[in-house]
């Protein structure tokens, strides 16, 4: 990293969600690409901001940027598969927050060779992660007929992916309109 280096923050716009505050502080200029609304803790040194809260996922936005940049290099099959996996994750396999733009981007990625077998491998949950997700689900309690609140073990730390997957799994259950998962993280 030098004074000409550029940090690109993707799928978040909060400085405290970067991997490391020390790492973030090493950059003078930042680009933000996100599909969440701009919030507090936004970088003051952003030289470019591409925030589209109507987009299905950050992968959709990244693909659009790459698709229309006009560079002669094309995405590889694995790169196309990774971006497609991200879109499929955020849209729950094209069932929520999908727009015509989402399908246009998916079609473009498919034309580049995104592979469903690769996507399955990328998206697979390992056994230990699956157990942690289910631990949170089992801890869930209905506070009303359509709302579930789950609380993690206070002596354990859970990562954000496990927490989100537990909440999404419960939200997909019949009759459930809202889920809340409260758990300790390493942050």
What are these model-derived regions, one by one?
Residues 2, 22-25, 42-43, 75-77, ...:
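Solvent-exposed alpha-helices and their adjacent loops that cap or buttress functional pockets
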């Amino acid at each position: 990293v030098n004074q000409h280096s550029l940090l690109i923050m993707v799928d978040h716009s909060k400085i405290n969600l970067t991997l490391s505050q020390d790492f973030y502080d090493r950059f003078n200029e930042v680009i933000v690409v996100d599909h969440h609304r701009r919030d507090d803790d936004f970088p003051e040194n952003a030289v470019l901001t591409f925030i589209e809260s109507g987009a299905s996922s950050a992968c959709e936005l990244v693909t659009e940027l790459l698709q229309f940049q006009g560079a002669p290099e094309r995405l590889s099959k694995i790169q196309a598969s990774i971006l497609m996996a991200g879109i499929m994750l955020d849209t729950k396999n094209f069932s929520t927050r999908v727009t015509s733009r989402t399908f246009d981007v998916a079609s473009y990625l498919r034309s580049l060779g995104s592979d469903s077998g690769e996507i399955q491998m990328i998206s697979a949950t390992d056994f230990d992660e699956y157990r942690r997700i289910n631990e949170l689900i089992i801890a869930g309690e209905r506070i009303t007929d359509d709302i579930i609140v789950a609380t993690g073990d206070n002596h354990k730390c859970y990562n954000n992916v496990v927490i989100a997957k537990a909440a999404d799994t419960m939200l997909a259950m019949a009759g459930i309109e809202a889920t809340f998962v409260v758990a300790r993280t390493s942050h």
